[in-house]
Amino acid sequence: MQRLNPWHGTCRLQFSADADTTHHQGGCTAPFKLMRAERGNDGRCELPLLHSAGGLVGGDQLSVDLELGRNSRALITSVAAQKVYGSIGRSRLHPKGTWANQSVSCRLGSNSDLEWLPQELVVYADALVEQSLDVQLADDASFLSAEIVRLGRTAAGEDLGQGCWRSAVSLRRIGENGTRWEQVDRLELSGDALHHRHGLNGDAVFGTLIWAAPAPLTNPTLKSLLTNARNDRAGLEGQMQCSRLEQGLIARYVGPSSRDARFWFSRIWARTRAQRQLSEPRIPRVWPLQEQPLRQQVFIENIASSNAATH
């Protein structure tokens, strides 16, 4: 599938705090649409984005630009899974295919808090897609992202074919002492990497959660957080690993189930909320879940550990 005139959709949003509530302003161009915002228990602005075109084809570009002012809190998600259709061999003009691109840029002011939680990306056979996430945050800001990608429609017996998925992530702290890198991540999945035991080993789902905490975590606090996150893997299928960042944590999922990836990441999300002494998260109303991923014991266990919270 190839459009003669590819989309270049943009979404630019600014968030500002007023007392205990965060407000947003800005706008989008087609095919983006903003849905109705909700207020979380902590005054957070919870905002779903709709991609009205139904999917991306080669040449399409999506750009999301988010700016959070001092003390503001926001949660951004998507209304549905994003689809990227095959590009290779679909056009006589570009028989080798053209790349679809999605870029997300975030700037977080002092004491701000952003949760970037889009629904999964489904990459069809022979699709070419690049994603980038660039985050600049103040020393005392918090940023959490969880992104899941399914390579091929496995329910239809399809794999990625000749397609390719690329991802670039960079997180930088901007403070009085200059800039320091929190995380730099470059990934490419295609060809042999999909089947090699050091790649996806034949599985179709890959996910990454990153939490950049608002303050350094003590060793006992971080050890407890990682131990609890590993315990949260119980009952879920796939390979799940988590480790520390300089000021936060990173978790990876490789397996057959986007549902299990989302469940595990949701449980870690709940733990990061408790660590910040915030209200327990509310699953976004647009997520099509038939089960509750946040088990009750998640919050019971966290009550004790939250006494060691650093922020």
Curated annotation (Swiss-Prot):
GO terms for cellular component: cytoplasm. It comes from Synechococcus sp. (strain CC9902). One of its GO terms (molecular function) is nickel cation binding. Keywords: Chaperone, Cytoplasm, Nickel insertion. Pfam families: UreD. It comes from the Bacteria. InterPro entries: UreD. The keyword Cell membrane does not apply. This is Urease accessory protein UreD. Belongs to the UreD family. It is found in: Cytoplasm. Required for maturation of urease via the functional incorporation of the urease nickel metallocenter. UreD, UreF and UreG form a complex that acts as a GTP-hydrolysis-dependent molecular chaperone, activating the urease apoprotein by helping to assemble the nickel containing metallocenter of UreC. The UreE protein probably delivers the nickel.
